[in-house]
Curated annotation (Swiss-Prot):
Keywords: Amidation, Cleavage on pair of basic residues, Neuropeptide, Repeat, Secreted, Signal. Induction: Upon D.coniospora infection. Its main location: secreted. GO terms for cellular component: extracellular region. May have antimicrobial activity. May play a role in response to fungal infection. Expressed in hypoderm. This is Neuropeptide-like protein 30. It is found in: Secreted.
Amino acid sequence: MISTSSILILVVLLACFMAASAQWGYGGYGRGYGGYGGYGRGYGGYGRGYGGYGRGMWGRPYGGYGWGK
């Protein structure tokens, strides 16, 4: 059975993740998970997110909408 403290930790981690998502943005012009290298740059280089051009994991453009120009 999951303890109350474990649930609390999970909630805090989820809140931190949501705050980070709001700050960086999944579709935030090259500043989401596919854009840690700077504006318009994903891990794979210019115009790339995790999964390639415009498609990250689950088919989402993690690199943002304004990258790869």
